[in-house]
């Protein structure tokens, strides 16, 4: 199994189509299996229909997403987890440090 690349939402457009990604985002909207996540001024649309039966989504909730980027820029979600209580500054620092090592 291929590992997911840990990124920020604003880096999704720079990733290859089909690439497996992992990122954190705040729920801006959710309707009919389509999720809009934001982080600062960046946003991404995610299709959660594959995991839909197992998903409970609340507006403004922070979510940890693993999915594949489609050609149209939407991310097909493979795994979704709540990130309630996450220390955002520490998380951002950890992602930046990890990216420097990759």
Curated annotation (Swiss-Prot):
Q: Which domain of life is it from?
A: Eukaryota
Q: Which InterPro entries match?
A: NA-bd_OB-fold, Ten1_fungal
Keyword Transferase, does the record have it? no
Among the GO biological process terms of this entry, one is:
telomere capping
A GO molecular-function descriptor: single-stranded telomeric DNA binding
* Any Gene Ontology CC annotation: telomere cap complex
User: Which keywords does UniProt give here?
Assistant: Chromosome, Nucleus, Telomere
**Annotated compartments:** Nucleus; Chromosome, Telomere
Query: Short name of one Pfam family for this protein?
Result: Ten1
Biological role: Required for telomere maintenance.
Complexes and interactors:
Interacts with stn1.
Q: What is this protein called?
A: Protein ten1
């Amino acid at each position: 199994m291929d590992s997911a690349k840990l990124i920020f939402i604003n880096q999704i457009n720079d990733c290859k189509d089909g690439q497996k990604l992992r990122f954190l985002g705040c729920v801006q909207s959710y309707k009919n299996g389509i999720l809009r996540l934001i982080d600062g001024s960046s946003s991404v649309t995610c299709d959660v229909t594959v995991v839909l039966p197992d998903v409970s989504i609340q507006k403004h909730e922070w979510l940890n997403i693993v999915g594949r980027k489609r050609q149209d820029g939407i991310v097909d979600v493979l795994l979704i987890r709540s990130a309630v209580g996450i220390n955002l500054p520490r998380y951002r620092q950890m992602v930046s440090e990890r990216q420097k090592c990759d």
